[in-house]
Amino acid sequence: MTLGPPPLTGDSAAGVIARMLKARGVDRVFGLCGGHIMPLWMRLDAEGIALVDVRDERAAVYMAHAYGQLKRAIGVALVTAGPGVTNAMTGIANAHVARAPVLVLSGVPPRPQENRGALQDMVHTDLVRGITRYARTVREAALVPQELDQALARAAGLGGDPGPAYLDFPTDTLRGEVPRALQAPFWFEPQVASRCGAPLAVD
């Protein structure tokens, strides 16, 4: 008899996120670990993406901002629910003012517990919408590829200036399976960010 949730696979929403980020050239993620993001943390590690664990979520976003600028790419930060997001907001606001391409990922309680006083249950998107280019809660595993693609594109400057984009996911969504039919190959192809600056094009 085994206790706890089943092992996470590469077809889980968390696995698809990690695979897409790796395919898009993300080689490290800055964050502070927490229960709501453990599925994603585990799959990022499984994909060989370096996890830089910090002591404060502001630092995670600052570091993602700086790393992205140095690489002329999108920096990625991963923070947990509630105080993880509120702590990160200073870094998100700084990236917004600087028009820096940063993707911030977080988690929320499982869908059956939303708006019922669960641990660290907050509507994060309402908090960050004014300082991001894109802010969504992705509740269905099947929507993960297109929402992550859209967030990366908006952060890179699609339709306007670059800037931070924000996505969060219920923990049960992160553990849910993305149907193979929806894992189209183009989601996992490298894509040059539109306004980040292509390293080969910069003298």
Predicted regions and their residues:
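N-terminal alpha/beta PP-like core and its mobile active-site loop of ThDP/TPP-dependent enzymes
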Residues: 2-203
